[in-house]
Amino acid sequence: MAQTAQTKKKRKKKKRKKQSSRSGVLIAVLVAALILVVFVLFRFLRSHSAETTPEPEVSVSVAPTLPPSGLSAQCFGESDGYKTYISDTVTAKLGVDISSHQEWVDWEALAASPVGFVILRAGYRGYGDGSVNIDPYFAENLAAARNAGLGVGVYFFSQALTPDEAEEEARTVLSQLADYQIDYPIYYDWEPISDENARTATISATEITSCAQRFCQTIEQAGYRAGVYFNLDIALSYYHLTDLMDYEFWLAEYQDTPSYPFAFGMWQYTDQGTVPGVTGGVDMNLCFKSYGN
C-alpha cells in the first residue's frame, strides 16, 4: 500500500509538470501573437499616416546671383492688339519669330506693321536621328527681311547631346549667314521633347548647359552676339543659368506680364499672335535692349 501511494504521488507530480509545460507554451504563443498584432497595427498606422499626410512643398528658386530684370509691371501695356513696354529708359520693340512653319511671308506688309524685327530659324536638329537640317525658307527669309528694312536675328533649334554637336549646329548657322548682316543675337533654342525615344530624353542639366556654352562661344568667336532661349520650366529644371550669364537671354512666358524675376533681353509673350503678311498664329516678342537698327 505504501508503494502504491508513493507511485500515485509521483504520477501526480509528472502530471503537474506536463500541465505546467503546456501552460508555458500557451503563454509564449499568446505573447508572440500579441507582439505580431502590435507590429502589424504599427505598420498599418504608419502606412496610413504616410498616405494621408501631404508631403511638405519644396520651393525651387533660381540662383540669386543672377541680376534682376529691372522691368516694372506698370510699364507694360497694349496698343493696336500688341504688347508694349514704355518706361523712362526703355521703349521695347515689337518682333516676331519666323520659320518654315509660316511658309510664305509678305515681307513688305510685315515691315509696314508695328513689327520692327524678326528672329529667323536657321535650322534644326532632329530629335530622333539627330540629323542637322537647314530651314528651307531661311535664305529667302533672310534676304527678304533685310530688303524690307527689318532688324534680323537668328535661332537654331537644338537637340545636341554633346558640346561638339552644339558646335556643329553653330557652324551650320554661320555657314548660312554668308554676307548678310544681322542685328540681333543668334540664339540657342534647346527644348525637351515629350517622346521617350527622343535622343535627349536622359540628358542632364550639366550636359545641356555645356552644349549651350559651346554653341554661344562658337557664335561669338565669329563676331556675332549669342543668346539662349528658354521658358520657365527649362530655366528652373534644365539650365545652370549662372554659367550662361555672359550671353543674352530670350524668355518665353505666355502671360500678361513676365513673372521671371531675373534679367533677360527679349520676351516671347504668345505663340498665337496675328500680324500683317503672315498667315496663322505667330510667335510675338518684345525686345528691351537696343540690339539692332
Task: Identify the residue ranges that each predicted region occupies.
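Short beta-strand/turn micro-motifs composed of small residues
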Residues: 156, 230, 253
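Functionally critical loop-and-helix segments that line ligand-binding/catalytic clefts
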Residues: 62-98, 102-104, 244-293
